[in-house]
Structures are given as C-alpha cells and as structure tokens.
Amino acid sequence: MGGTLAIQAQGDLTLAQKKIVRKTWHQLMRNKTSFVTDVFIRIFAYDPSAQNKFPQMAGMSASQLRSSRQMQAHAIRVSSIMSEYVEELDSDILPELLATLARTHDLNKVGADHYNLFAKVLMEALQAELGSDFNEKTRDAWAKAFSVVQAVLLVKHGN
C-alpha cells in the first residue's frame, strides 16, 4: 500500500511543476555547498536541538558552520542525494531511494516534525537564493514536490 500512495502522490505533480523544480534545482546547484549549508543553519536557528543530531557540528556558530569541513561534506552529501530525488520525481524508483533515507533518519530519531521544519526552511532558502525567480509557480511546484517526498518518507517511517 505504501508504494501505491507514493506513486499516486507523484502523479499529482504536473510535468510543468517537475520542470520548474528541476530547472531551479540546477540553478541552486551552482552554489550547492553554500545553499545546503544555509538550509541547515536555518534549521539549527529554529531548532537548536537539531544541531545535536550532528555531534561533529554540535555547538558551532553559524559562521563556524559555514567554514566547517564537516558541514561542507554534509552539504555535498545532501545536495547529491537531493539531486537524485529531483531527477527521479517521476520515477517508480523514488520510493526506494527515499526508503534508505527513512532508515537513516529512523536511527537518528528524525521524524515528521523535522520534515515539517525542513520544508519551511527549504522554502525560505529557495526564496532567498532564487530571488525574483521564486514566484508563485515556483513556490507551488516546490511545495508539491516536497509534499510528495515527505509523504513517501512518512509511509516508509510507518507514521
């Protein structure tokens, strides 16, 4: 049943929305390390306890995080993973790709509240980075794409 829900949710994302997500993602990947680092700095600002899930980065200030090799390495991993998801938005493979992430997040006690915060922060970071390219269609496309990803993750978590 989980796979069916995921595939059905993917069907709700239009071809035009997928194109917008892919186009803007490619724009963002020109500065992937700084973009993803900014996302995590925003997460840690909203929820300082989330930073403790990364022992190697616990207690670092925003400026320390920006120059941290650990944060840069994590940003590269996250941007690579997200690039896979963006490319596979219309693929039956997406739920399986997300299952691996769900297992890792389960081990680190990352759940629905964290995904909701990530969605909020991602939208803020998208708007800040894309500027005037972040219009209503872009916002709607990203909101829908993230809702697809989040729905699959929550099914894989068993929530």
From Swiss-Prot:
Keywords: Acetylation, Heme, Iron, Metal-binding, Oxygen transport, Transport. One of its GO terms (cellular component) is hemoglobin complex. It comes from the Eukaryota. The modification N-acetylglycine is found at G2. One of its GO terms (molecular function) is oxygen binding. Residues 12-158 form the Globin domain. Heme b binds at H74, H105. The keyword Disulfide bond does not apply. It holds the Pfam family Globin. The keyword Acetylation applies. InterPro entries: Erythrocruorin, Globin, Globin-like_sf, Globin/Proto, Mb-like_M. SUPFAM superfamilies: Globin-like (SSF46458). Monomer. Caudina arenicola coelomocytes contain four hemoglobin chains labeled A, B, C, D. Belongs to the globin family. PANTHER family: GLOBIN-LIKE PROTEIN (PTHR47217:SF1). This is Globin C, coelomic. It comes from Molpadia arenicola (Sea cucumber). The lineage of its organism: Eukaryota, Metazoa, Echinodermata, Eleutherozoa, Echinozoa.
